[in-house]
Curated annotation (Swiss-Prot):
Binds 2 manganese ions per subunit. The lineage of its organism: Bacteria, Pseudomonadati, Pseudomonadota, Gammaproteobacteria, Enterobacterales. It catalyses: Xaa-L-Pro dipeptide + H2O = an L-alpha-amino acid + L-proline. Keywords: Dipeptidase, Hydrolase, Manganese, Metal-binding, Metalloprotease, Protease. This is Xaa-Pro dipeptidase. It comes from Pectobacterium carotovorum subsp. carotovorum (strain PC1). Mn(2+) 1 binds at residues 257, 339, 384, 423.
C-alpha cells in the first residue's frame, strides 16, 4: 500500500499539471467534477446500477458513490465532498481512509442538495464535468461551461498516457481477470452452461455482474459468432464444440479486458485454427513499437488473417495481398484489432491526434477500428484479432466473381464453432512492449 501511495502522489501531480494547463488555456478558475447521480427506473421506486463519471475516478478511486464532487484548480489539494448520508434504507459507504486520502481535502456531504451552499460562491469561470447538466445549471454554472468540448478534448487526449499508478492498477485488474478466466475454463471443461460459467467467473473474481467493466461474453458453439453475445443460456448444449469468453475486471476504477477461445476437442480443424491465430497474434505483438500508427497494425493483422485463411484452405487460388485488397478477410475479421484501455474499456480519444481534438477517422475499408493514433510510451491497448463464421457476413460472398475462392464446404464445417477471438492487454514502453496478460501466464 505504501508503494501505491507513492505512485498515487505522482499520479495526482500529473493530473494537477494537466488541470493547470487546461484551466489557463481556457481562462477558467476550476473544474467541478461530479461523480454522478442515481437514475430511478421509470414508474418505479428503485434505481439503475450506478456508474461513476470516468473523469471523476481518474482523480480518486471512488467508484460506487453518487453525489460526490471534486473541486480542482491545479494548485491547491483537490477538494472532495464525499456523500455520506444518514440512511437506514440503503448501505452508506464509509468516509474513505486509504492510501490516497492524505492527498485530498475531504468534507462529508450529508445531504446531496446542500452542495450549492458548500461550493465556492464564484462559479462564473468554473467548468462542470459530469452527466447531470441540469444540476450544473442549478448550481449557477454557465451553459457554455457545462462539459465544454475543448476542455474534454484536452483531458481525454492526455488520458491515453497512463501514469505509473494507473499501470499498477491495471496490472492488478489483470490479475483478477486471469483468475476469473481460469475458473471459467474449468467450468467449461466440467460441462457447465453459459450461465453457470459466468457465475464461476464472477465468484472467482469477487465481482457482481454490475461490477465488471462490461457485460461478460460467455459463448458456447455458434453463440461465439455474435460479437457481443450476452444471452447466457441456462442449459448446456448436448454437443459442446467451442467456448469463447470475453470478460474483464476492475481495480480502483481501471479495467482489464481479456478474451480466450477454446475447442472442446484438442485436435481437429478448429483447435488448429485457434493455435495458429494465437501464434500470429503473438508475432504481431512482437512487432509493436512506439512511433507507429495503430492503423498499420490493424492492416498487418488482416495480412496475417489472409495467411491463415490460405494455410487452412478456407480461401484458395488468390494471393494474400489480393485477399486483403479485395476485402476477403473482412467477413472473417469484421471488427478492429483493438482499442485504448483504461478508466473505460473502450477508452476515450482513440481517434484524437492532438489535445485540441483533431480527429482522424478509421479507414473506410475498416469502419469499426477504434483507434487511429500513433502509439507512444504510456499507452495501453488491446490486441484482439478474431476469425468468425458469421452467415450474414459470409452470405454476400457466396455469389459473384470471387465466390470460387472460398472453400465453402470447409467454411460451413466451421460455422457450428461460431468463431475465435483472442485478446491481450499491452503497454507501450520506450523500446519495448509489456504484455500484461501473458506475463500472468494466461495461455
Amino acid at each position: 500500500m505504501e508503494k501505491l501511495a507513492s505512485l498515487y502522489h505522482h499520479h495526482l501531480a500529473t493530473l494537477q499539471a494537466r488541470a493547470q494547463t487546461v484551466l489557463a488555456r481556457h481562462q477558467l478558475d476550476a473544474l467541478l467534477i461530479h461523480s454522478g447521480e442515481l437514475l430511478t427506473v421509470f414508474l418505479d421506486d428503485h434505481d439503475y446500477p450506478f456508474k461513476v463519471n470516468p473523469q471523476f475516478k481518474a482523480w480518486v478511486p471512488v467508484t460506487q458513490v453518487p453525489n460526490c464532487w471534486l473541486w480542482v484548480d491545479g494548485v491547491n489539494p483537490p477538494k472532495l465532498w464525499f456523500y455520506s448520508p444518514v440512511d437506514y434504507w440503503h448501505n452508506v459507504a464509509p468516509v474513505p481512509e486509504s492510501f490516497w486520502t492524505e492527498e485530498i481535502d475531504i468534507t462529508v456531504l450529508r445531504n446531496a442538495d446542500d452542495i450549492g451552499q458548500l461550493l465556492p460562491s464564484q462559479r462564473e469561470r468554473v467548468a462542470y464535468i459530469g452527466y447531470a447538466p441540469q444540476r450544473a445549471q442549478d448550481l449557477g454554472i454557465r451553459a457554455d461551461n457545462i462539459n465544454p468540448q475543448s476542455v474534454l478534448d484536452y483531458l481525454h487526449y492526455h488520458r491515453a498516457y497512463k501514469t505509473d499508478y494507473e499501470l499498477a492498477c491495471m496490472r492488478e485488474a489483470q490479475k483478477t481477470a486471469v483468475i476469473g478466466h481460469r475458473a471459467a475454463h474449468e467450468a467449461f471443461l466440467s460441462g457447465m452452461s453459459e450461465f453457470d460459467i459466468n457465475l464461476a467467473y464472477l465468484t472467482a473474481t469477487g465481482h457482481r455482474d454490475i461490477d465488471v467493466p462490461y457485460g461478460n461474453i460467455v459463448a458456447l458453439n455458434e453463440h461465439a459468432a455474435v460479437l457481443h453475445y450476452t444471452q447466457l443460456d441456462h442449459h448446456a448444449p448436448s454437443d459442446v464444440r467451442s467456448f469463447l469468453i470475453d470478460a474483464g475486471a476492475e481495480y480502483n476504477g481501471y479495467a482489464a479486458d481479456l478474451t480466450r477461445t477454446y475447442s472442446a476437442q484438442s485436435d481437429g480443424a478448429f483447435a488448429l485454427l485457434i493455435k495458429d491465430l494465437n501464434q500470429e497474434m503473438l508475432a504481431l505483438i512482437d512487432t509493436v513499437q512506439a512511433g507507429v500508427r495503430y492503423t498499420d497494425y490493424h492492416i498487418q493483422m488482416h495480412q496475417r488473417i489472409a495467411k491463415l485463411l490460405k494455410s487452412h484452405q478456407l480461401v484458395r487460388d488468390i494471393s494474400e495481398e489480393a485477399m486483403v485488397e479485395q476485402g476477403l478477410t473482412s467477413p472473417f475479421l469484421p471488427h478492429g484489432l483493438g482499442h485504448p484501455l483504461g478508466l473505460q474499456v473502450h477508452d476515450v480519444a482513440g481517434f484524437m491526434q492532438d489535445d485540441r481534438g483533431t480527429h482522424l477517422a478509421a479507414p473506410s475499408q475498416y469502419p469499426y477500428l477504434r483507434c487511429t493514433r500513433v502509439l507512444e510510451p504510456g499507452m495501453v491497448m488491446t490486441i484482439e484479432p478474431g476469425i468468425y463464421f458469421i452467415e450474414s457476413l459470409l452470405a454476400p460472398w457466396r455469389e459473384g466473381e470471387l465466390c470460387q475462392h472460398f472453400d465453402w464446404q470447409k467454411v460451413d464445417a466451421l460455422k457450428p464453432f461460431g468463431g475465435i477471438r483472442i485478446e491481450d492487454n499491452i503497454v507501450i514502453h520506450d523500446g519495448r512492449v509489456e504484455n500484461m496478460t501473458r506475463d500472468l501466464n494466461l495461455a
